[in-house]
Amino acid sequence: MHLVDSHCHLDGPKFANDLDAVLDRAAAAGITRMLTIGTGDGPPEVDRAVRVAERYPQVFATVGVHPHDAGKVTPQTFDDLRALAANPKVIGFGEVGLDYHYDHAPREVQRDVFIEQLRLARGLKLPIIIHTREAWQDTIAILREHWQGPGIRHCFTGDAAQAREGLDLGFSLAFGGVLTFNTAAAVREAAAMVPDDRLLVETDVPFLAPIPWRGKRNEPSFMVETVRKLAEVRGVTPEHIAAITTRNFNTLVGQ
């Protein structure tokens, strides 16, 4: 069984001392490729994921500004993102979007930076990775007006209605460890109705470890539990989930 972790954060301090061992465990679990998300701790640290991807052949990267860091953006930020995106290991743009849960940046600033990054990603012809938390209606309104192209709704935690809205926009939906939580019945209902060709899996490491590791530092090898739960929800085998999600990821990023 070969799997792709479509969203992880391997560049931060939580993996500073044992990343080689983490990636060895991922390989042993069948995780053959990983997409590490290049938001860092905001500008000017978005290059950290690219540096990780350059070190490991199985790791690829994105670049972008997380909505938490929208207030740190300067005009130079967009030039830096454009330059980093020229690296052949960069295969996506994100994670970008809106986060009204923490409001680390003013909402108007978040929206402006989101729109500008959509323009940049469109020009670069890169798929986008969307982060949205307690901001779905504003997120989807902006996408309807400013985006036409492929993308991933990362860490899908919505219900079936939100899933349909994302699918109608042409997005793929990525499910992570939350799918295994006892409180996630609505997420599992949504996961059951996503078409085969729009389904992805992810970890969002080091966050949101699946049961039985909930509350621990997450790592890519743990994704097998999410895959097992997703297979159970959809009435198929884990091998089927692995095959379709790997194919979908490769199609999405043009590889």
Residue ranges of each PLM-predicted region?
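Mid-domain alpha/beta scaffold segments of enzyme catalytic cores
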Residues: 1-255
